[in-house]
Amino acid sequence: MARIETTTRIAAPRERCFDLARSVDVHVRSAAGSAERAVGGRTAGLLGPHQEATWEATHFLLRLRLTSRITVFERPSRFRDSIVRGPFARLDHDHVFEDDGAGGTLMRDHFDYAAPLGLLGRLAERLFLTRHLRRFLDARNAELKRIAESDEWRRYLRDGVAPTDLA
């Protein structure tokens, strides 16, 4: 099993960062490099407790499908999405949000995963998979930071609710 940890400082309130991080629409936008899209479960708006989303994305020239569920939800401090079905033997992604003491947020990711195929999977983790997933998380976090620190966040949130959830 492998673990990736990241910390991103965002000059925006914790509640905004929390909600943007659980937005299906922001996720799709921030994962454009892998042509990721939501194809099942919650496909727009904000993911909440026990909700699932099924994602399709291209990684290593393979079109992959993964379904995750929100298994921990403590707004605005943290949430966890865990794999239900997909190409990993195990995957838990904890998103943690802390006030930075200056009106902003420290967003921390704890990404625990295990590749399938036993020894071959562990070898893949060490040789290339962890590096690939870290780059994916870093790119996603940079886009989330950019959105949160600009007025663009208003396209995705209104009073802690996604505009698509208001219809």
Task: Show the residue positions of the predicted features.
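Residues within alpha-helical segments
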Residues: F18, R22, S82, H110, ...
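Beta-strand elements of well-folded, non-transmembrane domains
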Residues: I10-A12, H59-L61, V72, P87, ...
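Hydrophobic ligand-binding cavity/cleft-lining segments
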Residues: M1-G48, A162-A167
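Beta-strand/loop substructures that line and gate deep hydrophobic ligand-binding cavities in soluble
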Residues: R80-L137
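Generic structural detector for well-ordered beta-strands
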Residues: T7-A11, E56, R69, V96-E98, ...
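Short, surface-exposed coil-to-beta transition loops
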Residues: R3-E5, R63-T67, R90-H93
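Glycine-rich portal/gate segments that line the openings of hydrophobic small-molecule binding cavities
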Residues: V28, A38-R85, L106, A139-R155, ...
